[in-house]
């Protein structure tokens, strides 16, 4: 999330898809539904914008965890306007998504202070 202010300074429109501060496994059903509704709404709005670049951060996880309408995400990736490139940060993304994106990055955690119970710190994790 630390990249968001810079992207906004550069004129990018950033749609954030989290309705709270919890991880999905910590959410109750109502929180999951609210987050999914927000994800779907943001993706619908993003798809309606004219843009050269569509960045789908953690879209594979959203797909796997059923936190986004799968048909909507499928359309966003496979039926995007001609000339629009798709950037995907992929953790657990389905193969079709990996094949369709123009750029795919997977960050693999080998060690992180979170594993020792250290909370996210301003200026480091966000």
Feature locations, PLM:
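Conserved P-loop
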Residues: 1-47
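Short, well-ordered alpha-helix to beta-strand connector turns
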Residues: 11, 50-51, 101
């Amino acid at each position: 999330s630390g990249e968001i202010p810079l992207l906004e300074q550069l004129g990018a429109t950033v749609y954030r898809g989290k309705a709270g501060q919890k991880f999905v496994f910590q959410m109750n059903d109502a929180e999951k539904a609210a987050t999914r509704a927000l994800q779907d709404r943001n993706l619908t709005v993003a798809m309606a914008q004219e843009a050269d670049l569509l960045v789908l951060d953690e879209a594979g996880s959203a797909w796997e965890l059923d936190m986004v309408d799968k048909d909507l995400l499928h359309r966003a990736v496979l039926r995007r306007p001609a000339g629009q490139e798709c950037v995907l940060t992929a953790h657990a993304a389905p193969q079709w998504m990996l094949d369709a994106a123009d750029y795919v990055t997977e960050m693999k955690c080998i060690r992180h202070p979170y594993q020792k119970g250290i909370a996210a710190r301003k200026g480091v994790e966000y």
